[in-house]
Amino acid sequence: MSMRMRKQVCKKQWERVRQAPDRYRQRMLKQAQGPGSLGLAGRLKTLLLWMSSSGLKKLDFSYLADIPVLEDLNMKLDQRPTAIIGQNGAGKTTLVKLLKGFVKPVSGSIYFHGEDISGKTVAMLAGSVGYVFQNPDDQIFKYNVMDEVLFGPLNIGMDPEQAKKEAAWALELTGLSGKEKENPYDLELYERKMTAIASVLAMDTDVLILDEPTIAQDWKGRQIIGSIIRSLSGRGKLVIAILHDMDFVAENFERVIIMAHGQVLADGTAKEVFAQEEVLKKARLQKPYVMQLSEALGYEKSYLTVEELLKDRMSLCAAIKLLKKSSITKNSCLKQGFFVFGHRKISE
């Protein structure tokens, strides 16, 4: 990798830190700069490891000998937050269960930082790959929230003091601070879901797998999960989520993978993937609602999120008002900070 590319990667990593919510920024900076941390050079090295030697190679899997579920699957893994979407039966859950070691491939390999992990047990992968079940009741078994969150880190050999720090951080990140002594089954479903997420966050794994994290979550819960994804990404972790919520996918994931019948139909950014009409039709998926709206209104540009749409359209309104109030020419308009986008003039 050239020095220029290294600088670009570093700039992108630090931009994530800068854009993080205030209450998480200091923790992320400490993680990147503080004593005992990897530092920026170490983070870059970890990123290069992800890019070069993590993924699935020629993977085959079936539950029954004559009914293949995944066939000749090849996929590279990197640090980008990744959403896996597709209809039920597409092979999404089977794929992430293979990554966690719940099931073993019939053939092929799974590599993690250059090491073949396809033969490792769930216990052996506990410290590196975290998994949050769709139903938190399949995961929770302790009598209070703190004991539940501490169970994982203590059982993978984490120092007790460090485990308490990680647990406190996980509870703060999930909005559960102050509920440490509550019985998880006295909490609402969305809070139990956050408890399950916190219990895996505290283990500080390199990979976090989330199975339908937005189910039973209101707007606030969705915002918290989005913050968790950004925070982990800023710490150099990989978040993989199985989702049916296309709007949440568009808002929070840099990489989107569409699966159908055990095959990958599309793999790219959200904008790239949701622009593939035939692939979406084949996978029986819909575009995010905002994208559908912008296309129905005839906009030349497709918008993925409400924020993107409002920012652009408000800039358009400002430009139109400015032009109506004066006899400004197009050239002078450009000089005042506007640029032309299609047939519209948008403020920078």
Q: Which role does the model predict for each range below?
A:
Residues 100:
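Helix-to-loop junction immediately C-terminal to a conserved catalytic motif
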Residues 243-244:
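H-loop/switch region of ABC-family ATPase nucleotide-binding domains
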Residues 261-262:
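Conserved ABC ATPase "signature" C-loop
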Residues 85-87:
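The feature captures the beta-strand-to-loop junction immediately N-terminal to the Walker
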Residues 161-179:
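Conserved ABC ATPase "signature" region
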Residues 2, 6, 10, 14-17, ...:
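ABC ATPase nucleotide-binding domains
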Residues 108-116, 125:
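Conserved ABC transporter NBD signature motif
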